[in-house]
Amino acid sequence: MGKQVEIFTDGSCLGNPGPGGYGVLLRYQQHEKTLSEGFYRTTNNRMELMAAIIGLETLTRPCKIVLTTDSQYVRQGITQWIHNWKKRGWRKADKSPVSNVDLWQRLDQAISRHDIDWQWVKGHSGHNENEHCDELARAAANSPTETDTGYLENRD
């Protein structure tokens, strides 16, 4: 496996649904890069997923990654729930469709070439990188520029 990279992510939503954004910090050795984007109408879970997806999709070659998120939804979804969702044709145990399936499928694709250690950190607990991503996500949510077409298409 290639480079060892750290990725820190956070999503934010001003209302749920409402304007939202994601923030990402990528670190390789002494190099850091931040990414963020805001959406006019979305949900907090979609922004948490987008943060992880964008962080992973930014990498140009397979890497060994430690990805830190404050979202149990993302961490549990990708490490525990996704296997059964895929077996059931992207349905939950009660046969209902998986929420945010467009993003779960995109995340599933994004992880396929990497070796990832998924870490969870409590949000708003003073973790420097998580706090920085939270600031990026909130700023993006306050200045949205994009339409979350997946949210619009998958709305009940």
Swiss-Prot record:
Binding site for Mg(2+) 1: D10, E48, D70
EC number: 3.1.26.4
Cofactor(s), by name: Mg(2+)
The reaction(s) this protein catalyses: Endonucleolytic cleavage to 5'-phosphomonoester
Localisation per UniProt entry: Cytoplasm
Entry keywords, A to Z: Cytoplasm, Endonuclease, Hydrolase, Magnesium, Metal-binding, Nuclease
UniProt GO BP: DNA replication, removal of RNA primer
Matching CDD domains: RNase_HI_prokaryote_like (cd09278)
PANTHER family: RIBONUCLEASE H1 (PTHR10642:SF26)
Subunit structure: Monomer.
Protein name as it appears in the record: Ribonuclease H
Species for this entry: Photorhabdus luminescens (Xenorhabdus luminescens)
Designated gene of the protein: rnhA
